[in-house]
């Protein structure tokens, strides 16, 4: 069927190779390659450049990609409507999220959902806010769990307030505070996390008319925690990013408090039953997780 060949082409573009696309689709590598070649032969155009360095889209492939992606999405939605009519809890939910959510929320949430509706599968892509925003607009994912830009084309509902916490070495002078005023950080080297959510922190600091001199900039929460543990400086991280490393350092909330807002975001109103089930159950499962901590 042509739709199967469309899926093979789309998966190859998204995965970057026939081998990875084959793993996603549960086909052999040669079968995926052949389906893409069949499309090229059927249409009389080259869709992919095949080089030793990897696969890239040709101009024709780039021009046709949005249409092929739309057809695959429409076919998935059609199946969803049919499943809704017959009452079947089946389908695929495509999620895009940030690292902290993928590490701390999704294992527990997806385990419970798969017990409740074993016929539903989940695909999880991990990226930063800008990338997830693009995935939603390109229809590569159904749901985003992140902090979106202000965009009227996306539906966003607040899901969680992730509190920013000051982290510092054990035995540090800041440990005398129950809540740390920002002015107290000006006396210590500050390590900045170079992530997109830092803009939200920066906006909060500007609103409070506070400025913290940055001494170091790096990425990766674990790297920052290890630098802080070694006495290199202090930092501010969202609480979710500290879950696995909080025993290594001390932490306190800010005074006044600041939060990273995490939203559940969709592009339009979801119609597929599997996506509806995920959106309906997610808030309750997160509340249950919070009570169990």
Language-model features, listed with the residues they occupy:
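Short helix-boundary/capping micro-motifs
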Residues: 11-28
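A short LG(V/I)-centered, amphipathic sequence patch enriched
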Residues: 40-59
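Central regulatory/effector-binding core of bacterial HTH transcription factors
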Residues: 86-152, 218
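Flexible hinge/capping segments at coil-to-helix
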Residues: 87, 154-164, 168-190, 273-276
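Hydrophobic hinge/microswitch elements
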Residues: 128-133, 137-140, 146-147, 196-250
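Short beta-strand->loop
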Residues: 155-165, 239, 247-261
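Secondary-structure junction motif
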Residues: 188-209, 272-279, 289-290
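A late-sequence structural motif
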Residues: 251-292
């Amino acid at each position: 069927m042509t739709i199967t060949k469309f899926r093979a082409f789309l998966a190859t573009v998204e995965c970057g190779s026939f081998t990875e696309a084959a793993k996603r689709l549960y086909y052999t590598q040669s079968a995926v390659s052949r389906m893409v070649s069949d499309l090229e032969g059927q249409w009389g155009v080259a869709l992919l450049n095949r080089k030793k360095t990897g696969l890239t889209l040709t101009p024709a492939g780039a021009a046709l990609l949005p249409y092929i992606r739309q057809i695959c999405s429409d076919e998935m939605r059609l199946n969803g409507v049919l499943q809704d009519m017959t009452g079947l809890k089946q389908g695929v939910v495509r999620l895009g999220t940030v690292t902290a959510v993928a590490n701390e929320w999704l294992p527990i949430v997806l385990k419970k959902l798969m017990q409740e509706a074993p016929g539903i599968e989940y695909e999880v892509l991990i990226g930063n806010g800008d990338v997830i925003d693009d995935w939603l607009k390109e229809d590569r994912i159904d749901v985003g769990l992140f902090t979106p830009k202000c965009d009227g084309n996306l539906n966003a509902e607040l899901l969680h307030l992730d509190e920013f916490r000051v982290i510092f070495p054990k035995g540090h002078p800041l440990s005398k505070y129950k809540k740390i005023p920002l002015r107290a950080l000006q006396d210590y080297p500050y390590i900045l996390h170079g992530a997109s959510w830092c803009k939200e922190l920066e906006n909060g600091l500007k609103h409070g008319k506070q400025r913290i001199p940055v001494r170091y900039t790096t990425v990766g929460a674990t790297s920052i925690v290890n630098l802080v543990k070694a006495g290199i400086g202090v930092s501010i991280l969202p609480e979710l990013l500290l879950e696995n490393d909080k025993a290594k350092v001390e932490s306190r909330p800010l005074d006044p408090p600041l939060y990273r807002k995490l939203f559940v975001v969709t592009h339009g109103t979801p119609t597929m039953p599997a996506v509806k089930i995920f959106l309906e159950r997610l808030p309750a499962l997160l509340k249950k997780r919070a009570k169990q901590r």
